[in-house]
């Protein structure tokens, strides 16, 4: 039986059960939290809240969540471990990668081939270490990769992360999920780069593609081979009315009758806490 890494160790894929494919236990701005969170962040309260919410999820029949929280989204595995210890009925699958809409964090931007400080490419080495050795001494191994291609497209920083993700995929075989911007059709850019880099496109998930009601765009993505062609929160923020967010089931209603051969994912894109201070007005 094939196995997959989880927060509580390797598990047989047969044990995954009902799975939500794109959920965040926490999304945090770590430096803001550490420097300014004292008045509004209580670690014990947030952990307890996370335990309660994930326990409720298990009670509704969910046995696995796939958490694409990586560097840039406040990944901190010890906190997730604490919660998972208290929700033993839930498997949590975690990721490695880097989340940025444009430029790299300065640490990486100044290090690597062609940068001010030169040196080897660090990103792929770090991603591979997270998968093979575990994340930050926790022993928890990443099971998939995460990157972003947003509105600005394949900027130098975005391209460098994406190529490091592709290199890691070739080395380890783990799948990839990409945050895309459906309004700007950046899923196409992601597939173009990954195809050129020799990535197995059947192991690529194009996240948030369901934010679009453009069925031709969605069909073009799926016709290129990814069996899990989009994730969607059921809302559109890329093509909304001026007033804000709205439910976006149109693509699902129109695509479903003709798309039974296109396996899709429809997760919630949910978090127990985004680490925001309370509103004061």
List the predicted regions and their residue ranges.
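Active-site beta-loop-alpha junctions enriched in small/polar residues
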Residues: 24-26, 70-71, 95-101, 150, ...
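Active-site gating/metal-coordination segments in enzymes
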Residues: 82, 86, 91-175, 227, ...
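Active-site gating loops and adjacent loop-to-helix segments of metal-dependent hydrolytic enzymes
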Residues: 23-48, 96-120, 141, 264-281
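Catalytic pocket-lining loop regions of alpha/beta-barrel enzymes
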Residues: 166, 170-250, 260
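Alpha-helical scaffold segments that flank or form the walls of functional sites
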Residues: 17-28, 34-91, 119-141
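Divalent metal-coordination and catalytic microenvironments
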Residues: 22, 65, 169, 228, ...
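Short acidic/histidine-rich active-site segments
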Residues: 177, 230-233, 257-278
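Histidine/acidic-residue-rich catalytic or RNA/ligand-binding cores of hydrolases
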Residues: 29-33, 77, 104-106, 186-194, ...
């Amino acid at each position: 039986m094939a196995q997959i890494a989880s927060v509580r160790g390797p598990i047989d894929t047969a044990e995954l059960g009902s799975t939500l494919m794109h959920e965040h236990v926490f999304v945090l701005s770590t430096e803001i939290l550490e420097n300014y969170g004292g008045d509004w962040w209580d670690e014990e309260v947030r952990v307890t809240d996370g335990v309660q919410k994930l326990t409720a999820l298990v009670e509704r029949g969910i046995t696995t969540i796939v958490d694409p929280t990586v560097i840039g989204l406040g990944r901190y595995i010890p906190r997730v471990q604490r919660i998972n210890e208290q929700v033993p009925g839930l498997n949590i699958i975690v990721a490695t990668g880097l989340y940025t809409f444009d430029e790299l964090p300065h640490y990486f931007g100044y290090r690597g081939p062609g940068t001010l400080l030169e040196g080897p490419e660090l990103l792929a080495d770090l991603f591979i270490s997270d998968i093979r050795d575990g994340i930050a001494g926790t022993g928890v191994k990443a099971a998939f990769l995460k990157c972003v291609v947003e509105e600005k497209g394949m900027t130098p920083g975005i391209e460098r992360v994406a190529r490091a993700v592709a290199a890691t995929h070739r080395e380890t075989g783990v799948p990839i999920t990409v945050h895309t911007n459906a309004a700007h059709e950046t899923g196409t850019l992601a597939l173009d780069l990954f195809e050129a880099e020799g990535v197995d496109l059947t192991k690529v998930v194009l996240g948030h593609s369901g934010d679009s009601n453009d069925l031709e765009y969605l069909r073009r993505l799926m016709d290129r081979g990814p069996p899990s062609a989009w994730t969607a929160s059921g809302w559109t923020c890329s093509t909304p009315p001026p007033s804000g967010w709205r439910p976006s089931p149109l693509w699902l209603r129109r695509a479903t009758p003709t798309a039974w051969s296109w396996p899709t994912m429809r997760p919630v894109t949910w978090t127990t806490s985004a680490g925001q201070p309370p509103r004061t007005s």
